[in-house]
UniProtKB/Swiss-Prot annotation:
A Pfam family annotated for this UniProt entry: SH2
The keyword DNA damage appears for this protein: no
Keyword tags: Adaptive immunity, Immunity, Innate immunity, Phosphoprotein, SH2 domain
Protein name as catalogued: SH2 domain-containing protein 1B
Quaternary structure annotation from Swiss-Prot or TrEMBL: Binds to the phosphorylated receptors CD84, SLAMF1, LY9 and CD244. Does not bind to non-phosphorylated SLAMF1. Interacts with SLAMF7 (via ITSM phosphorylated on 'Tyr-304'). Interacts with Src kinases HCK, LYN, FYN, FGR and LCK (via kinase domains). Interacts (phosphorylated at Tyr-127) with PLCG1.
Gene3D superfamilies in alphabetical order: SH2 domain (3.30.505.10)
Segments forming domain SH2: 5-101
Lineage: Eukaryota, Metazoa, Chordata, Craniata, Vertebrata
Function (record text): Cytoplasmic adapter regulating receptors of the signaling lymphocytic activation molecule (SLAM) family such as CD84, SLAMF1, LY9 and CD244. In SLAM signaling seems to cooperate with SH2D1A/SAP. Plays a role in regulation of effector functions of natural killer (NK) cells by controlling signal transduction through CD244/2B4 without effecting its tyrosine phosphorylation; downstream signaling involves PLCG1 and ERK activation. Activation of SLAMF7-mediated NK cell function does not effect receptor tyrosine phosphorylation but distal signaling.
Modified residues (Phosphotyrosine): 127
Superkingdom, natural source: Eukaryota
Keyword Repeat among record annotations: no
Length: 132
């Protein structure tokens, strides 16, 4: 995913630290859900609390966001369009999205894969698996 505010497998705790560091309402980022595989979390800060909105992948690649109860179901063709919608006030979130918190390094998902590969390559074992 090529969005600068997508942080991959960022933990909830690390997410809260990043968003609350500046103490500004409307800071936001996207991360993978820790509890539901394949679901994204749009996290936004407001009054020193981080609010999390789940984003589900629908049929045909569309995205659906969970907002305030009673709000109509909202579906978007892309994540960029979804974010754009919620940058406007009064759209069903606690606060509109103001400032994306961009990742400063490759998303954790890819960094984790690289670390796994380095661990495998750098193992000090004399045993070598040979594939048929």
């Amino acid at each position: 995913m090529d969005l600068p505010y997508y942080h991959g497998r960022l933990t909830k705790q690390d997410c809260e630290t990043l968003l609350l560091k500046e103490g500004v309402d409307g800071n936001f980022l996207l991360r993978d859900s820790e509890s539901i595989p394949g679901v994204l979390c749009l996290c936004v800060s407001f009054k020193n609390i981080v609010y999390t909105y789940r984003i589900f992948r629908e049929k045909h690649g569309y995205y659906r966001i969970q907002t305030a109860e009673g709000s109509p179901k909202q579906v978007f063709p892309s994540l960029k369009e979804l974010i754009s919608k919620f940058e406007k006030p009064n759209q069903g979130m606690v606060v509109h999205l103001l400032k994306p918190i961009k990742r400063t390094s490759p998303s954790l998902r890819w960094r984790g894969l690289k670390l796994e590969l380095e661990t495998f390559v750098n193992s000090n074992s004399d045993y070598v698996d040979v594939l048929p």
